[in-house]
């Protein structure tokens, strides 16, 4: 088995999908989890206005609405959380995403004050954060807020991770990578677009340039610029296609380098890091 085949198998990626079937699969998956643990009453997700959170948010709201109808439990709710750092440049996209999702509840937590307070506390301890590390601080503060909300609403935090993100480890460890349940796992980027199109999402929300937008020195830095490969490259790789060797090597390099992000904390019994 080649490394490409191993990666595809590990991430559950498929070359072709039926969007309607995958929508149903994700919704039923979320419903089944909540039914298994009836003390859970909410799904919580941060909404950024990008493709991934828009899709995960819509699937979460669909799952909650169906489960509420089936069980008669009106305590069930989907909570969409806006988590700007100060003023968000693409705020209108966030509002458009919320209008499309139609969540039961919308909360806004501006993380800037918390991030600056943490940065100042570290500075007083003699640690000056780089712009890159400050970006990770933002991602972790956002997740901290979501877990606080979930803790107070008997909820679970929904993640937006998918195969095209997992393969490169393009997420912050214990930030946006630290979630409870990931309904998009297995899908690549273009497949996520197919699901949103099938759901009637406004095109500009899934055709916009993907960006984590965490760094102050490089605002709205495109994911593809940071990775050195395009999402089309990554999707082709996950679909089993043959790529230029340099591109394939870059993708595989990211996968190996970020293996620790896809695992629980390393123990004495782990040996993947010795490769």
From Swiss-Prot:
Protein keywords: ATP-binding, Ligase, Magnesium, Metal-binding, NAD, Nucleotide-binding
Entry's Gene Ontology BP terms: NAD biosynthetic process
UniProt-listed InterPro entries: NAD/GMP_synthase, NAD_synthase, NH(3)-dep_NAD(+)_synth, Rossmann-like_a/b/a_fold
Key word Cell inner membrane present: no
Sequence positions that bind Mg(2+): 52, 165
Binding site for deamido-NAD(+): 140, 173, 180, 260-261
EC number: 6.3.1.5
GO CC annotation: cytoplasm
GO molecular function: ATP binding; glutaminase activity; metal ion binding; NAD+ synthase (glutamine-hydrolyzing) activity; NAD+ synthase activity
Keyword Metal-binding: yes
Binding site for ATP: 46-53, 160, 189, 211
NCBIfam families in the record: nadE, PRK00768.1
HAMAP family reported for this sequence: NadE_ammonia_dep (MF_00193)
Record function comment: Catalyzes the ATP-dependent amidation of deamido-NAD to form NAD. Uses ammonia as a nitrogen source.
Family assignment from sequence similarity: Belongs to the NAD synthetase family.
Name of the protein in question: NH(3)-dependent NAD(+) synthetase
Organism: Salmonella paratyphi B (strain ATCC BAA-1250 / SPB7)
Lineage start: Bacteria, Pseudomonadati, Pseudomonadota, Gammaproteobacteria, Enterobacterales
